[in-house]
Amino acid sequence: MTTKDLDAFFTKGWNGHDVDVLMTFMSEDCIFESVAGPEVCGTRHVGHDRVREAFARIFTAFPDVHFRDARHFVAGDRGVSEWVFAGTASNGKRTEVQGCDVFTFDGGKIAVKSSYFKNRTA
């Protein structure tokens, strides 16, 4: 996995609103740890099908989701992407928040995507 690959993951997959493209970057036994949920890690989605469902729910919750100002770093089998998440929720509330993903790679694919973002009060 390279910084160019991570850029394509965000521009073609997330900003293209294309779950199929996103999943081409994920390993078959991938894990997505979302920002919110009952577990210490948020909510842990395990396996290709569960991760696909979780990604699709993000597009449903924020139909105009867009990641901007992304910067990507890769060192061996680990990587980080910093970004600004922007989107309008189905209730009309606009969200813009700075965040990052911490990645673990395996075989040139994303094995773990652990997401974090700031907790804005306004």
Placement of each model-derived feature along the sequence:
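Short, cysteine-centered beta-strand-loop-beta hairpins and adjacent loop/turn segments enriched
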Residues: 86-96
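A short hydrophobic beta-strand element
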Residues: 76-85
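Short beta-strand segments enriched in hydrophobic/aromatic residues
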Residues: 26, 85-87, 117
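Short beta-strand edge/turn micro-motifs at domain boundaries
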Residues: 98-121
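A solvent-exposed, acidic/Ser-Thr-rich amphipathic alpha-helical stretch
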Residues: 4, 19-71, 76
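Short, surface-exposed coil-to-beta transition loops
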Residues: 66-68, 95-101
